């Protein structure tokens, strides 16, 4: 299961990953993805933060905290 967040302003990805590691046993990995040019223009954002979990409950818990 993937939780996606567009990165705006001062969102702290390091803190978000540390929280996932400590609180979500099924945390698998994370990726910071640079958006394509059209998507950048459409939503005025350059990067997306993807966090991967093996369990839907952890993904939901993480979403409630960070999204």
Label for each model-derived stretch:
Residues 45-67:
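Short, compact, well-ordered microdomains
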Residues 1-46:
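Structured alpha/beta or helical-core interaction and ligand-binding surfaces enriched in interleaved
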């Amino acid at each position: 299961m993937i939780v996606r967040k567009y990165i705006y302003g001062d969102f702290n990805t390091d803190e978000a990953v540390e929280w996932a590691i400590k609180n979500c046993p099924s945390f698998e990995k994370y990726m910071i993805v640079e958006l394509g040019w059209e998507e950048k223009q459409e939503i005025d954002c350059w990067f997306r933060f993807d966090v991967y979990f093996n369990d839907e409950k952890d993904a939901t818990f993480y979403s409630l905290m960070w999204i």
